From Swiss-Prot:
Protein name: DNA-directed RNA polymerase I subunit 1
Gene of this entry: NRPA1
UniProt subcellular location: Nucleus
Cellular component per GO, a single term: mitochondrion
Organism of derivation: Arabidopsis thaliana
Family: Belongs to the RNA polymerase beta' chain family.
Amino acid composition bias (Acidic residues), ranges on this chain: 176-185, 262-279, 1339-1354, 1366-1379, 1388-1399
PANTHER family: DNA-DIRECTED RNA POLYMERASE, DNA-DIRECTED RNA POLYMERASE I SUBUNIT RPA1
Amino acid sequence: MAHAQTTEVCLSFHRSLLFPMGASQVVESVRFSFMTEQDVRKHSFLKVTSPILHDNVGNPFPGGLYDLKLGPKDDKQACNSCGQLKLACPGHCGHIELVFPIYHPLLFNLLFNFLQRACFFCHHFMAKPEDVERAVSQLKLIIKGDIVSAKQLESNTPTKSKSSDESCESVVTTDSSEECEDSDVEDQRWTSLQFAEVTAVLKNFMRLSSKSCSRCKGINPKLEKPMFGWVRMRAMKDSDVGANVIRGLKLKKSTSSVENPDGFDDSGIDALSEVEDGDKETREKSTEVAAEFEEHNSKRDLLPSEVRNILKHLWQNEHEFCSFIGDLWQSGSEKIDYSMFFLESVLVPPTKFRPPTTGGDSVMEHPQTVGLNKVIESNNILGNACTNKLDQSKVIFRWRNLQESVNVLFDSKTATVQSQRDSSGICQLLEKKEGLFRQKMMGKRVNHACRSVISPDPYIAVNDIGIPPCFALKLTYPERVTPWNVEKLREAIINGPDIHPGATHYSDKSSTMKLPSTEKARRAIARKLLSSRGATTELGKTCDINFEGKTVHRHMRDGDIVLVNRQPTLHKPSLMAHKVRVLKGEKTLRLHYANCSTYNADFDGDEMNVHFPQDEISRAEAYNIVNANNQYARPSNGEPLRALIQDHIVSSVLLTKRDTFLDKDHFNQLLFSSGVTDMVLSTFSGRSGKKVMVSASDAELLTVTPAILKPVPLWTGKQVITAVLNQITKGHPPFTVEKATKLPVDFFKCRSREVKPNSGDLTKKKEIDESWKQNLNEDKLHIRKNEFVCGVIDKAQFADYGLVHTVHELYGSNAAGNLLSVFSRLFTVFLQTHGFTCGVDDLIILKDMDEERTKQLQECENVGERVLRKTFGIDVDVQIDPQDMRSRIERILYEDGESALASLDRSIVNYLNQCSSKGVMNDLLSDGLLKTPGRNCISLMTISGAKGSKVNFQQISSHLGQQDLEGKRVPRMVSGKTLPCFHPWDWSPRAGGFISDRFLSGLRPQEYYFHCMAGREGLVDTAVKTSRSGYLQRCLMKNLESLKVNYDCTVRDADGSIIQFQYGEDGVDVHRSSFIEKFKELTINQDMVLQKCSEDMLSGASSYISDLPISLKKGAEKFVEAMPMNERIASKFVRQEELLKLVKSKFFASLAQPGEPVGVLAAQSVGEPSTQMTLNTFHLAGRGEMNVTLGIPRLQEILMTAAANIKTPIMTCPLLKGKTKEDANDITDRLRKITVADIIKSMELSVVPYTVYENEVCSIHKLKINLYKPEHYPKHTDITEEDWEETMRAVFLRKLEDAIETHMKMLHRIRGIHNDVTGPIAGNETDNDDSVSGKQNEDDGDDDGEGTEVDDLGSDAQKQKKQETDEMDYEENSEDETNEPSSISGVEDPEMDSENEDTEVSKEDTPEPQEESMEPQKEVKGVKNVKEQSKKKRRKFVRAKSDRHIFVKGEGEKFEVHFKFATDDPHILLAQIAQQTAQKVYIQNSGKIERCTVANCGDPQVIYHGDNPKERREISNDEKKASPALHASGVDFPALWEFQDKLDVRYLYSNSIHDMLNIFGVEAARETIIREINHVFKSYGISVSIRHLNLIADYMTFSGGYRPMSRMGGIAESTSPFCRMTFETATKFIVQAATYGEKDTLETPSARICLGLPALSGTGCFDLMQRVEL
C-alpha cells in the first residue's frame, strides 16, 4: 500500500538440509509504520511532473507515469534505472511532489478526532490534566503487564481536593519511573488482553469531550467536514467569542495562509492562537473587538498547513500521551510524529505493477495510473494558481480538488462522482475476497496438481487412488540421486517424458534441463548420474555426502503419495493422502467407495483435486499423518467416518446369514480374491499398471475347519470372515466383539410363515414365532477370539463400536484400512457369483392387508371434519351445512388470525399421525408383503441399512403421507384454497397435503404437485444455507485458528494466553475418545489394550496429567461393582485396581498430543455439521405455544454476533418439590400479559351518516364494546371492574384516538390531500421517526434489510426481500455492515464527531419501545400499584385538539364511545382499528415476560438435577416429566424471583447469554453457551463432542466477558495484525497497525501463510536438532 510500509523485518539464518539452493533467510517479525517524507524520497528514482503518458510517436513521455526510469513497459525496452529488460527489472518507484501539504486520507478520521479534542488557544487537550495523566499511567501500566493496577486507577475517580490530586500525581510519577526502569518491556510478549485494554483506554480517552478547555477555559469553534478530507470551522456564537475576548483569548487568522503554507514563524499561518497579556487585551480598541466578532460569525476553512501547526504544538505540549501514537508498545523504535497525518508527496508505484489492459485496438489504462494522472493534473493546476497569484478562494478550491484526487487514489469510495466510485483505489486492491491478502497471499495458485471426474473402483485399497496415465506423465517429483535409487532413475531418464515410468527434466548444481527427445542423448545423461566422486557400490558408505546435487524429475508412479481434496473443504477429512495406482486405459480418477462419506462425494459427475507433494518432509507427513487410513474417526465426535456402503452391505448380509454354505473351491476363491494374503506385507505388492492386484506374496493363509464335513466339506459364510480376521490380526492377540445388528430378531423367520401360510391357529403361530426368537439369535453379532459365532455383518458393524471400529481401536488405522479393503473385494466377488435383484413382487402387499390399508386411509379423510367439529363444539350426529362451516372458520380466523390456523393445522397433523400409524400400518412392511422379509430384496436393503429407508419403502408400497413445507402443512392462498381445484377452507387431509396414494399405483396430479412443492423446499434450503454456514465457519476458523495444545497440556492462543488448563477439561483427544468409557469392551479385549501400552504410559504420560479424571474413575468403579463375581474372575478383575490400571493405560494413550490444532478442529466440527441444518429458523417447543430460534440463525446469534437482544429469549424454572401443576398455573396467570382484546366479548359499530353536532354537519360512529364478566378472567388474577374501566378510559381511548388520527393522515396522503393538522398528538412522533428511518434504510440498500418494518411489507414482499438477501454472497454479508464506519476508517471511527457522541447509541443499548401498560414493569402481583398507575395515567390524560370522541360511557360489562367525523373525511374501518388497538393496551403486564406456559422438567431447555443441585444425580425421564416447570417467553429474572416460595430458583435458566452473564457471572455464561450450541445441534440429531463446545465457550469468555467471533470480537483483540487484515476490512486494520506501530511476531497461522512459512502447530511446533559427534 502506498505510504504504508513494513520495517524492521527480523531475519534468522539457517542451512537447508533438503535443497542445495534452499532459503538462507527467514522472516521472524514484521513491524508496521507509515512512510515518512524521507522514506518516499529514498525510494524514488524520478520526480513525476507531467500528466502526459506518451508522446506523438507512442513512446513513454519523460517525467510521465510511463517514464522508463520507473521500469520498461514493453518486453523489448530496457530500464533506464537498472538497464534490465522487463522480465528481470524489479521496477522502480517515483514520486509526485505536492505544491501544498494535504491530509493523509487513511488517517483523516483520527486527525479530525484529535482536532476536536485539542484546544486552539493553549494547544493542550481540552480534557482535564488529571484525565490525560491517568490515561498515560494506565497505558504504561498495561504495557508493563499490570492490568489490575490500571483497572484500579480507572475506578479511582479523582475528587476535587488537593490531596487527592497530589496522590494521583504521585501514583503517576511512581508508575512512570518504574516503567522507565523496566528494561524487559521491549522484549515482553504482548497478549490479546493487554492489546484490548490499551485500545479501550485510547478509545475512552478520545471519547472525552468538552465545550471549553479545562486549562485556559477557552471556548473552541466547532468543526465540520464539508467533504471527506477537508475541515471547516463553524461560526461561533457571539457569547462564546465574547467570553474568549474577556479571558484574553483570541483566534488569529493568518492572511498568509495560501502564500506561505509551510511557514513556521509566528507571523505565518501557525500563529493561529496566542494567549496575550490580560492588561494589554483590555486596552484593545472596540473596533478590533467588533472585527473579531464579525470574523467568527461566518464559516471558514481550516487548511492543512494550519492544522499541521496545531498538531505540532499539541505534540510538544502533550508529548507523553502523543508518543503512544506511532509506537503503542513504547519499544524504542524510530518514532513517527504528527507528520504522518499529512502528505507532501505521493509515491508512484513502478510501471510493471499497473500495466495497461489491451483488448483489440483499444488500450485501457490501469485504475491506479488514471488516479495518479488525476493527482498530477490537480497538483499542476494548484501550482499554476499560486504562480499566477489568483484569489485566495480560488486557490483553496483547487487545494480541495487536489485533496479529493488523492482521496480517490487511496479509496475510491470517498469519491463524489459515481464513475470514480466504481474504479479501484488502493484500499479496494486490499479488501474482500479478491483483494491482495486473501487472493494473493492467503490463497495462491498451485502447481503439481490435477483435477478430474471421479469414478468408483471397489478393487483398489481404500487408501489408494487410481491415476490415469495422462496425469502420471505430466506430474513429476524431484528425486535426489543416491546410490540406492540410481538404477531406477537411470531407467526413468532413458524412458523419457513420453514413456511411463519416465522423467521430464534433469538438474544439477548449475542448471535444469529438459530431457532431449532422442533416446541416445538421454542414455548419455543417464550414464553420468553417478559417474564422478562419491559413487560407490557398498551400501551406506560414501565418500561425499553431497553428490553434486543431481536431481531427476521423474514421473508419478505406483506407491507415491498424493493429497486428494474435494471442495467444499469443510473439515479435516476433506483433504487426505492416498497412495497412487497408475491405471492404464483410464481417463478419470478412481476412488474407493469407503471414501465417499469422508469427502461427501458421489459418482454423478463430482470432480476432485489431486496435489503431488514435492519434498520429503511433505511426503513423510502424508504417509504417516494425513494418510486416508488415519482419518477413520470423525473429528467432530470421534465416530467412524469410513465404511462400506450399498451393495457391499447387501453382499455382507447374504454372505454371513446362517444358511449360506460354500464348498472348498468357492471358499478358497473368495479368500484369495479378497487379497488378504498381501495385507500382512508392509510394502506395495503387485505389478505396476495393472487394474487388479496380482498376489506376489508367499505368505501362507491359515484356513479354518469346515462347519460340515459330510457328505462334502462345507464352510459357512461366517467362516470366511473368521479366516480374514485371523489373517488381519496375525501376530497379535485375537479380539472379541459384541454388537447388535440393524436386522430385527424375526427377520429370517420366513420359513415359519411358509409352513402353514393359511393356518388359523394363532396360538400355534405364536409358539413358532417365540421359538424362532429364541433359536435364531441373528440380531446380535458376536465374534469371540476372532471366531464369528452368530449374527450378520450389516451397516451397524461399520458404525460406532462395530466390528471395524473395534479393529481400528485395538490394532490401529492400517489394520482397519486393510480390513475394509479386504471386505470390499470379498463382498464384491461374492455378489458377482450370488447375484442380487429387485422386482415388482418385492413391493406388492397381500390382498387382505391392502384392503385394510385402503380402509384405514379412507378413515383418515374424515379427520379434518372431526377436528373442526371438536374445535367448534359441534356434535358428531348434528348435520351442518358446508357453507356454515366455512363461515365459522372465517370468523375464527378473523378473530384469532394466524395462530388459529396454526393450531388447527397442528391438531389435524396429530390426528393424521395417530390414524396413519396404528393398526395394519405398523406391520404392513414386515408382515403384509407378498414376499417375506427374509426373501424380500427391498426389505433387505432398507432394514440392513444398505440403501434407502423404511420411509422410501412406505412411499412405494403404502402411501406418501403428509407433505411438510417449513414444518407446516401446505399453505393456503388468499382465497382459502391450497390449489384451485379444492374448495375454499377445505380442511380435508388431502387438500392440506396428505397423500394417500403410493408410487406403486401412481399419484394424482394434485398429490404430484404437493410432492414437488416439498421437494423444491429442499433444493432452496441447500442453495441458501451454503453461504450462511460458510461464513459462520470462516468466522470460527479465523478466531480459533491459533489455539493449540502445548507441551504443558494447556491450550493457548498465539500470544501465550491460556484458554484452557486441560484440553476439553480432561485432555483427551476427540479422535481417541470413543472407547474410553466402554469398560466392557476394554475388559474383554484387555490383552490387546495392555499390549499397546508401555509401563511408562501407565505411570503417567506427563508430569502435568498424572491421574484419571474423577468422572472416569467413578464410572470404572461402578462398572466393577455391578459385575457378577464369576465375570470378575473370568476377566481377572477381582479388584478395582486391575480395571483402573487398564482404564488408566487407555486414558493416557488417548491424550491429545502437543501441537494438536484443537482450535481449527473445534471450528470445523461446529461449522461442518451446520451445513446439514435446514433454514427452519423457528421450531415449535413443546406443544407449539412458543417459538425458539434454531438452526444457523441461532448459531449466528450465539457465536458470530453475541447478540444482547436475541430474537426469542426464554426462561425456564422447575417448581419446588411437592408443588403441583395447579401452583404452576397460578404463577402463569399472574405472569400472563392480559390485553383489552382478551376481555372483549363482542364489538358493535353503528354509523349515523348525517347529523348535526354543535352546529356542524357530521357523521357519528358509535362503538359499543361488550366485555366478559370477571368470572371469565384467568383464575388467579386480581383484575376488577375498576381496573378495566380506568384502563379503557385512560389508556385505550387515548391510543384509539391516536390510531384514528394516524390512519386518517395516511388516507389523506393516499387521496392526495395535504391538509395541515393542527398540533402534534401523542404517539405521532414515532411515525415521524419511522419515516426518517425508512429514508435511511432506502439509502443503505446493502444492509440486509435490517431496518425495514415487517408490518409494512406484505407476505410476498417479505419473501422477495428475504430471497434478495439470501442471494448475497456471504462475503458481502460481512464486510458492508451498517454499524461499521466509512470505508476509510481511522483507528477509532465511531467516535469521530463530538456532536454525534451525545446522540449516538449502539443498537444493543437502544431500549425497545414498550407497549402502553397501566402498571409498573416489575410489578407482577397485587392490584394496588395497578390502580395507582392507572390513576396517574388518568391525571395525565389531556384532550388533544384533534380528538374526535364526543361521548364516553362505561358501566358494568359495557363500554360505549362516539366519534365525530366531518362529511368530507374518508371512510375508515373503525372496528378494525379498535381491535388492533385493543391488542396493544395491557390491563396486566409482567415486565418483559411476553408469555408464560406450564411445561415439565423433561423439556430439554429446563435444568433439573433433583432437590440438591450439588449432587447432580441422574434422574429418569419419567420422573422429570412428572415434575412441573415454567416456560416463559422473555427474560425478567426479578419477576420470577418474586415466586421463590413456589419456584426452585436455583435452577432458573435463560437462553439469553448476556443476561446470564450480567446476573450470574461468567461461568454461568460459559455453561449457557455450551448448552445452547448443544441444544441447536441436538434438535437436528447432530452429535458434536462436548470438548469442542468447551473450547469455544472458554475462548468466548476468556476475557471475563462475552465476546463475539467477528471482527469486533476476538479478531479485533488479536495481537497479530496479519490475522486481523486477512479476515475482513483489511484497510482498517492495516491503518491501525501502522498508526500504533504494531509488530507481528508471526505466531498465528494467517501471518505465517502470508509470508510463506509453515504454521507453528502440529509438526511445525518444534525444531529437530541433529546430534553431531566431534
